[in-house]
Amino acid sequence: MALTKAEMSEHLFEKLGLSKRDAKDLVELFFEEVRRALENGEQVKLSGFGNFDLRDKNQRPGRNPKTGEDIPITARRVVTFRPGQKLKSRVESATPKE
């Protein structure tokens, strides 16, 4: 199961005593700041969590899987995430929930 923004808002409501509206606004504002920074070409560093980076990919040859026709895959910018050491360690030592 995936963690959603709604669940994050609910956790903030329960743990910090924020109103549901304020908790939702805080989550939205956080993600909007991450989006804004990436749109402006900035790296996003979240200490203890990881880094969001932008990477430019060059045009490359590809193939249409249905027809087998060779087609160019256009150059584009992609977002990558590199987890920090603290996050890696915690995930590796966590016991999976079933």
UniProtKB/Swiss-Prot annotation:
GO BP, one annotated term: positive regulation of metabolic process
Chain positions covered by the region annotation Disordered: 49-70
Gene Ontology CC annotations of this record: cytosol
Gene Ontology MF term list: DNA binding; structural constituent of chromatin
Cited CDD domains: IHF_A
Keyword terms: DNA recombination, DNA-binding, Transcription, Transcription regulation, Translation regulation
SUPFAM superfamilies: IHF-like DNA-binding proteins
Alphabetized InterPro entries for the sequence: Hist_DNA-bd (IPR000119), Histone-like_DNA-bd_CS (IPR020816), IHF-like_DNA-bd_dom_sf (IPR010992), IHF_alpha (IPR005684)
SMART domains linked to this entry: BHL
Domain of life: Bacteria
Function statement: This protein is one of the two subunits of integration host factor, a specific DNA-binding protein that functions in genetic recombination as well as in transcriptional and translational control.
Known partners and oligomeric status: Heterodimer of an alpha and a beta chain.
Family from the record: Belongs to the bacterial histone-like protein family.
Name the UniProt record assigns to this protein: Integration host factor subunit alpha
Gene: ihfA
